[in-house]
Amino acid sequence: MKNISILEINLTNKNQRFLERLKNALNSKGFDVIIKNYNNIKSKNPITKLIKINKLAKKQKKDEFYICLDKFDSADIYLASSGVQNIYKKLDKFWFLNPISIIESIIEKRCINNSIKIITNSNLVRYQLETIYNIQPDKITTIYPGINLPTQIQKGSAKMQLCKELGIDMELPIILFVSDNFKKDGAKEFIELLTHINKANAIIIGNDKATPKYRQMAKKLGVRVIFKPTPKVINRYYEAADIFVLPSLYNSFSTQILEALSYGCICFTTAQNGASEILKDEFIIQSKDDENVTKFINLLLSDHSLMLNISAQNIKLSKQYTVEDNLNQILKVISENIH
């Protein structure tokens, strides 16, 4: 039986948990699996580092089967969960001034072309890969992400505690935004949307270096927003919130949407976020000036029974997207393609 290596460049806590689950599941099926992390490769030049990592991975491969979470040109199965490089370029009109962007595009193309199978986390990314790289549809499988579902939800007590902690009005609904990349996930658009929303408590959570700029923007527009850094445990914010808005410019699939749904938040995002594929049309923001969405949000803020009804529906919806289901689907694709 062929040995499997799971490759990752930048190991985060979230990725590490997924990698361990995948490794253990493959071990239980009789595969010998190791996790290779290349974050310890040192280089002052990020371009040199990226090239060096890919060369080293290729040299080490021999007869191993590579499952890659990052872009490696020696990938057998590529888990394309971070979006498409050529799409990110469109968000930055000066992308050509960043040499690393060019190298990443080259490696991405090789990764896509050389891999046996690609697993995307949304049909948005699937369509983009098929279009940009002229990939045959049967080479790509879409598997939506999964989350650990909450064991209990007590929105009332969670809201009371958070409002007391932040010194905000308990009687007002909470509208939440969560991201560590404010530009990509639309913090600007979120703040602008708030200017059309009836009175509510607005909270932005995230570790973004540009936070002071967004604070100033909110102040200039006369919008009261509470900014908080990303906490170790964020679930209590989802549990306390009524509405979650993520007007992404581009995101392959924000798991924040799943987490918010699981705690009964009413969620809105754009069609440029793969997570929109699991939402009904009325919850998809079509443009930055989408009056239908702002009117709907204002309706929700004034109709508590409607809000409770949709909240219950969203909790039920989230139960379709568990880490167990996600892992089982990925294992099935691996088993069908390993040689």
Q: What annotation goes with each model-predicted range?
A:
Residues 17-24, 173-196, 212:
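A conserved mid-protein helix/loop that constitutes part of the nucleotide-sugar donor-binding site
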Residues 101, 113-156:
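Donor nucleotide-sugar binding/catalytic pocket of nucleotide-sugar-dependent glycosyltransferases
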Residues 147-148, 178-182, 201-214:
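Glycosyltransferase donor-sugar binding loop
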Residues 153-168, 234:
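A short helix/loop element that forms part of the nucleotide-sugar donor recognition site in Leloir-type
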Residues 210-212, 223-231, 237:
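Active-site donor-binding acidic/aromatic loop of nucleotide-activated sugar
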Residues 249:
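Aromatic "clamp/platform" in nucleotide-sugar-dependent glycosyltransferases that forms part
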Residues 265-269:
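Short hydrophobic beta-strand element within catalytic cores of glycosyltransferases
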Residues 282-291, 299-304:
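Conserved acidic donor-binding segment of nucleotide-sugar-dependent glycosyltransferases
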